[in-house]
Amino acid sequence: MTLSFSTNTDRRAPPLVLVTHEFFPHRGGIAIYAAEMARAAQGLGYEVEVWAPALPPGVAEKGWPFKVRRLPLAGDHGLLSQWRMARQLEAQRDQLNAATLYIPEPGPLLAMLLLQYFDRLQPARLLLTFHGSEIQRLASRRLLRWSTTHLLRKAVRISVVSAYARDLFIKHFPESAPKIVLTHGALRTDLAPSPPDPAPRAGATTVILTVARINPRKGQLQVIEALKALPAAQRASLEYWVVGSHSKENYDTALAAAAARADFPVKFLGDVPDEKLDDIYRQAVIFAMTSMPHNPSVEGFGLVYLEAGAHGLPVVAHDIGGVPEAVTHGETGLLVAPGDTAGLTAAFSQLIADPALRRRLGAAGRLRASQRTWRDSAQSLFGQPDTAPPF
């Protein structure tokens, strides 16, 4: 969607302040989304400043093309972090009231739900992005739904990361439908993948790779169980590699137990830095992230599927949430219904046995990953900064 603008060239857009709880060195799709939208907005010509949680001790700041202000808070979704974020926003209300305030994720959104009732923080423009799971959480309780509806009325533009998230949002907050734009994610700017060899030499290890935080919603357990049901000949050369930080739940224990029962190696590689991920992708043959419904959480899109595609890997995933917008069944990967363990095993078996299919899906994945840009998404949400949009 392209925004229309006034022809009065004296009305430049106000500075853009992006406030997020998830930013470097935090890992994950939302942290990437926040950083790349800031980078793209700066590239469009906006004066961008990102407000993010304090760096951990010993971690140096990256060289960003925009300003970064570190706030004295941890950046989780706990009540203390929400209170501290609210205090920071209130303390800087004069700056924010003269700026475009962009909230790209649910952390600071919760603080905004509280501050809106004081009517002291009134940014020149308020822009919001929703990813999926938070939509269900905000709609699940009457007070939260009411507060969110009130805040949405103040937003001039609302973006969602997938058509699935758009439909979910309109289902729960139909009044805001006219404000919605679609802002798909794209590849990280610093990603320069080396394509893997999709047809490993005879006798070589067949590596199945998952890159995701270790969490029930990411489906690592479902992958292990599906791989255990493969024919013995395919399991003989199989390894399953899991990249991702450990969960705070008891999921680690369940995964370790499942891995111990497998007759093939399951390697937990931990939280691998971005600069070392390329080598891991290059050794893999198939990428798998079989997202599962977990409480109110759902996969709204999945940037990591694009990253796997950029490395030329065919994808095995569940047909859930916004995943089909990142992975096209039969074109860039194979999709299976959640809970269909036999179907998941069959998908893995088909790809392991068919190098030509892997090459075809991998090539299509590389093409798909290159077609989306952060600039397009930033343009849809922010518009050009040379004139102020007549919202």
Identify the residue ranges that each predicted region occupies.
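Short His-centered aromatic/hydrophobic patch
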Residues: I103-L109, F130
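Conserved acidic donor-binding segment of nucleotide-sugar-dependent glycosyltransferases
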Residues: H329-G330, L334-A342, S349-A356
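Conserved donor-binding/catalytic core segment of Leloir-type glycosyltransferases
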Residues: S159, P200-K218, I224-K228, W241
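Donor nucleotide-sugar binding/catalytic pocket of nucleotide-sugar-dependent glycosyltransferases
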Residues: L128, H150-P193
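Nucleotide-activated donor-binding/catalytic signature segment of Leloir-type glycosyltransferases, i.e.
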Residues: G244, D252-K276
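Glycosyltransferase donor-sugar binding loop
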Residues: A54-P56, E239-T253
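Acidic donor-binding loop of glycosyltransferase active sites
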Residues: R282-S297, L313
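Short hydrophobic beta-strand element within catalytic cores of glycosyltransferases
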Residues: Y305-A310, P314-A317, V327
